[in-house]
Amino acid sequence: TQINATQTILANTQKEGANIDDVNSALDELNKYADLTIYNFTEMTRNIGTFTAAGVDLNTSVNAIKGIANLAAISGSTSQQASTAMYQLSQALASGTVKLMDWNSVVNAGMGGQVFQDALKMTARIHGIAIDEMIADEGSFRETLSKGWLTSDILTETLQHFTEFTDTYNEESLKRQGYTEKEIAEIKQMGITATDAATKVKT
C-alpha cells in the first residue's frame, strides 16, 4: 500500500535529508505520471521503495522508474512486463551491478533491444568504459556483463535518458557530465519519444 511504501521510502531517504513532504511530493509527481500512462502507480511506488532501499536517492529513483516505464512503452512491453523489469533492476541496483541474469529478465520483458543497449553504451563511454572493445572481445553485449561494468550509476543515469528534461536534468547537466551537443540532442529526443509512447498509449 502507499502508506507502507511511503514509510519505507522515508526510512531509506531520511539520511539524505529527505522528509515526509519530499516523499509525498515525489509520489504525487509519480501518481500524475501513472495517470497519464498504462502503468500502475502502486507497483511504481513499491519499486521506488526497493530502489531507495538499494541506496538510490529519491529523485534518481523517481526518474529511473519513469525511465523504465517509458522504455517499456517504446519497446511495446505490457505494464506487467514493465513491473517485472522494475523489480529485477531494483534487485540489480541493490547488488551494485546488472548481471547477465538480470539482463535476461529485461530481455524477457521485451526491453533489452537495441534502443536500450545503445543508450547504455553511450553512458558507458562517457564513464570511460571501453564498451566497444569489450563487445568485440566478448562477442556480444550480453557477454560483457560478466565484467561488471553495468553499475547502478550507469543504469540509473541511462534510465533517466528515457525521461523528459526537468529543472535539474537538462542540457546543462548532461554537458557537465561530458556529453557532446549531438549526444545531448539525441538523448533529449529519445526522452520526448519515450514519454510520448508511454503517455499516448492511453488515449
Q: Across the structure, where does each feature detected by a protein language model lie?
A:
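H+5 position of the DHp
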Residues: T37-N40, T78
